Amino acid sequence: MSSEKYEPLTVETLANRLGAVDDICKIVGDDKSKWKIDEVGDGNLNLVYTVSSDSGNIIVKQALPYVRLVGDSWPLPLSRSFYEHEVLVRQAKRDPGSVPEIIYFNKVQAIIAMEMLLPHVILRKKLIAGEYVDGLAQRLGKFCARTAFRGSDLSLKTADKKSDTAMFQGNLALMGITESLVFTEPYFAAEMNHHTDGLDPIVKILRSDVKMKVEAQKMLMKFTANTETLCHGDLHSGSVMCTDDETKVIDPEFGFYGPMGFDLGMLTSNYLMAYFSQPAHRESNTLSKYQNWILEVIEETHEAFQNEFKKLWNSERKGILFPKSMFEDQGDSSEFALNEVLEHIWEDVVAISGIEMHRRVLSLAHNADFEEISDTKKRSQLEARNLMMGRELILNNKTIKNVSELTNMARKFNLENFL
């Protein structure tokens, strides 16, 4: 296909435009008349198509030059597709098997063709439906640890890390969205904000809490300045597809170099929002068991993260940070240094979790966990619990010492009625 001028794909044009790509034809066959093409994208930014035949299946994702959720009044650079591709390449190396296999990439057309994940289901859909996912915590905890460690100055050669950091600074439009929608706009009456009727008293509490807003902005300072590792940038339950045997992480177009705790914090917040939304999705006879399982997933994810991070610390610490020449080679333990790093990561996880819990209820793009609750009175009550716990996490990110304290806090807030 020509790559001279960008043109959005359609169901009608996709086969002709991609039909000459050998790597695609190897999977779905040369006979384009037998390709079944459907548009399946339900996200905020991109076109997504499935291409199926008797031979095989693929996913084709194309960036649009604007935010699909809003329209062409909010332009976005097509280069985000390039950064998504680059993140996927690095994640595939740092945690093999954790992301979809890339079949084809066209930078000018902003197209990525990938393996179709079957019979995988979006994690958020499973959480809303009350489905249990075996091995979820282990797989995602290890993913966060491996990508955080192996993308950092603990592991990479400093020249490679610095050049990669410089390249990803070009993803500034997507970083700008995070800086605005996540860290800033929930805390004032921004133009595109919206929230459920009945939440006004809670919103007033949050937006008048100067100490909390300062803590949120301090986390934004870290987001903009601390290029610790290559982050997925948007690791929510809609960015994970899974079966009981396999978990794949998708959609890293918000990739950037930032705090090591960013991805784990985003993921944790999404588990907490799933937890607080459950009373609207479950019958009373299954509610407690499923909510407890979600909290167990949070605890086990963090345990898996710490265990894997410690393992990599001992086996792959070859970068400029905390070198063995300063510790083990002199007969000194590096355990104190490791614990300091993990404590630093944990504080960021807690703060980011609270901020994202606010963003997903007050800013532009909300979570289906709450949005699919048709009873707005019920929804606002559950969202209020979520918002008030988010406030607690932001304010106390340095005093909540471990994940057990966090999950116990969730149990407490789950019993409160703030409206």
Task: Please place each PLM-identified region on the residue numbering.
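Conserved ATP-binding subdomain of kinase catalytic cores across diverse folds
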Residues: 52-57, 62-174, 314-318
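ATP-dependent phospho-/nucleotidyl transfer catalytic cores
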Residues: 121-232, 243
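Active-site activation/catalytic loop segments of kinase-like enzymes and analogous catalytic loops
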Residues: 86, 261-331, 353-370
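Extended charged low-complexity segments that act as oligomerization/scaffolding linkers
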Residues: 109-112, 131-134, 302-307, 329-348
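Regulatory N- and C-terminal appendages and interdomain linkers associated
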Residues: 1-39, 155, 327-419
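Conserved NTP-binding catalytic cores of kinases and kinase-like/nucleotidyltransferase enzymes
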Residues: 1-110, 244, 404-419
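Active-site acidic catalytic loop and adjacent metal/ATP-binding pocket
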Residues: 38-53, 59-60, 214-264
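A glycine-centered beta->alpha junction motif in the catalytic cores
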Residues: 63-70, 114-130, 149, 273-281, ...
